[in-house]
Design a protein with these regions (language model features):
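Flexible loop/turn segments at secondary-structure boundaries
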Residues: 1, 32-36, 113-118
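Beta-strand segments within the central parallel beta-sheet cores of soluble alpha/beta enzyme folds
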Residues: 1, 23-28, 104-112
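Short glycine-biased active-site loop of nucleotidyltransferases that positions the nucleotide triphosphate
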Residues: 2-6
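Glycine-rich loop/linker segments at domain edges
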Residues: 7-90
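N-terminal leader/propeptide and maturation segments of large enzyme subunits in energy/redox metabolism
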Residues: 75-132
Length: 132
């Protein structure tokens, strides 16, 4: 059997305050596409969407699709979203471990507000403050 999810390598730098609030993220994400690019270039926007689940403050993400001599991967459900979400959660766990805080506390402090959600998701419908 061939296929599977695309492996990624991420090199990142994250800025944060002593209370766990993240102020900036700079990341370089390399997607291993295998010998054939196939669906891989379409993963980039989905991967970015997975990263946007937290309010990073200032965010700079550079994603590269890397053609290698390995077997190609295929598209699976939510291609890119899983990798982006995993990267985001790994960074939050790293911040929590560095500060000695509970990871859920750090995650909660970095969830979007209505205003930050409008900045990170400008082309979508973001509801008002009622019930948010």
């Amino acid at each position: 059997m061939m296929g599977g999810r695309h492996p990624t390598k991420t090199i990142y730098s994250v800025g944060f305050k002593s209370d766990g609030r993240v102020t900036s993220l700079s990341a370089r994400v390399f997607i291993d596409t295998g010998w054939s690019t196939d669906f891989s270039p379409y993963m980039v926007p989905s991967l970015s969407a997975g990263l946007k689940k937290y309010n990073w403050g200032c965010m700079d993400v550079d994603t590269k699709v890397c053609k290698t001599n390995l077997c190609s991967k295929s598209a699976m459900r939510a291609p890119g979203h899983l990798q982006g979400s995993f990267i985001a959660d790994t960074i939050m766990e790293h911040v929590a471990a560095t500060l000695g805080l509970d990871v859920h506390t750090v995650i909660t402090r970095n969830l979007h507000t209505v205003d930050s959600a409008k900045l990170f998701f400008p082309n979508s419908i973001v509801g008002g403050t009622d019930g948010y």
